């Protein structure tokens, strides 16, 4: 049976070594597998859910992310790389799916709850951010993805997608939507620590070694890295 894989990144900043170890390296391997079709999305619409006040940041980083993809070995002749906003049908499908999901169900997503807390939204949660797991479901099902690689923290998102698929097929009594399988990282998979030693390498914390960094930038960052005095 052939596999259809959907994955991607939000263009909120340049990609770093943590992205390479965590997902990009695996995508390059997947594109070379037999009977595997892979779609990689630059999720600019999703990036706007918490960057609506700075759209230029998102626009500028679309190109940066695309260049990073090519630099690590993603081959456009083997992998379909696309920009989310260039396919308006995804937003349309998201609107239909929103009618199948209750507010209480959205509240129960532990990943979204944690992200809302981390971003300190308080009571001012953007509706687009609160509902972005539904948008992800639209992206996944539109391409009839059979497998979706995610980290442990993103597992609740895929569970939400699977619920939407089951509900849609049950309500309309047709197996129209494909139920995607979750691909989790290996148990020994390690996250890279940021150069400041304060948690994982992160775009938002600006503590990464970026794929586009110059040799001098990399050397300077390595020399300043936090090390255990013991």
Residues covered by each model-derived region:
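N-terminal Rossmann-like or analogous alpha/beta NTP/dinucleotide-binding catalytic cores
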Residues: 3-138
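Active-site cores that bind ATP or allylic diphosphates and position pyrophosphate for catalysis
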Residues: 113-230
């Amino acid at each position: 049976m052939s596999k259809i894989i959907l994955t991607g990144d939000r263009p909120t900043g340049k990609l770093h070594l943590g992205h390479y170890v965590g997902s990009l390296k695996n995508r390059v391997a997947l594109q070379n597998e037999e009977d595997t079709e892979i779609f990689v999305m630059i999720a600019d619409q999703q990036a706007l859910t918490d960057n609506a006040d700075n759209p230029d940041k998102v626009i500028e980083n679309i190109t940066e992310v695309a260049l990073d993809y090519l630099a690590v070995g993603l081959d456009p002749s083997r992998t379909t790389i696309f920009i989310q906003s260039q396919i308006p049908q995804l937003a349309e499908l998201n609107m239909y799916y929103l009618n199948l999901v209750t507010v209480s169900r959205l509240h129960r997503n532990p990943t979204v709850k944690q992200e809302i807390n981390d971003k300190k939204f308080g009571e001012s949660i953007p509706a687009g951010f609160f509902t972005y797991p539904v948008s992800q479901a639209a992206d996944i099902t539109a391409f009839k993805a059979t497998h979706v690689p995610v980290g442990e923290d993103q597992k609740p998102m895929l569970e939400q997608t699977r619920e939407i698929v089951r509900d849609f097929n049950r309500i309309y009594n047709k197996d129209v939507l494909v139920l995607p399988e979750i691909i989790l990282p290996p148990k020994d998979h390690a996250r890279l620590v940021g150069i400041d030693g304060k948690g994982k390498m992160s775009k938002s914390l600006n503590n990464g070694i970026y794929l586009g960094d110059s040799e001098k930038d990399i050397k300077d960052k390595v020399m300043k890295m936090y090390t255990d005095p013991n």
